[in-house]
Amino acid sequence: MDIKEFKENWGLTEIPTELEKLIYFQTNISSYENYSDGFGVLIDEKWGLKSWSEDDLFLEKLFPFAQANGSGSFYCIWNDGTSKPMNNMPIVVFGDEGGVHIVAENILQLLHLLTFDTEITVDFDEIFFYKDEDDYEESEDLDEFLKWLKDDYNLDKIEDTSTIISSAQDKYKENFEKWFKQYY
């Protein structure tokens, strides 16, 4: 994936360093969906978002950047209007079957969730990561992903995803839902 093309798609000259490094990792060390089950950074022209609302005020606050699972859910950075740097903005998941939820407080927390190495399940009322140990197959490049996260961000493999999700929802869910209801 070309980082310049990714930035141009968002109409920005800069993107979060964590995202730029992730794109480099996916392009040069691993590949799409090979380091965390169902996940891959992609260039998205907001077609998925437009199925929720075509209002420019809605679209300009959301930055889709990755596939969340193999069935069409996707992750976005949400500009919540607080003037914080983009790498500290909350992450939202839009479900392919419906359901829109805050999933992480920022991009780094999402990267930590990805170390669980299973697709996110997005229902109307909740989101969760579930791993059936009897059926689990580790992603081909998970070890490289874990090494990269440890070296760059001192993050280890996560065993419980609910703490990150709950913390993010406690912090942002109410404001996000209030904002989102204006458009959907």
PLM features per residue range, with description:
Residues 53, 57, 95-102, 133, ...:
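Conserved aromatic-histidine-acidic binding/catalytic patches
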Residues 59-60, 87-89, 138-145:
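Glycine-rich, flexible loop segments associated with nucleotide phosphate handling
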Residues 112-177:
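Mixed-charge (acidic/basic) macromolecular-recognition segments
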Residues 87-128:
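Compact, glycine/acidic-enriched structural inserts
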Residues 1-84, 146, 155-184:
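A surface-exposed partner-binding patch
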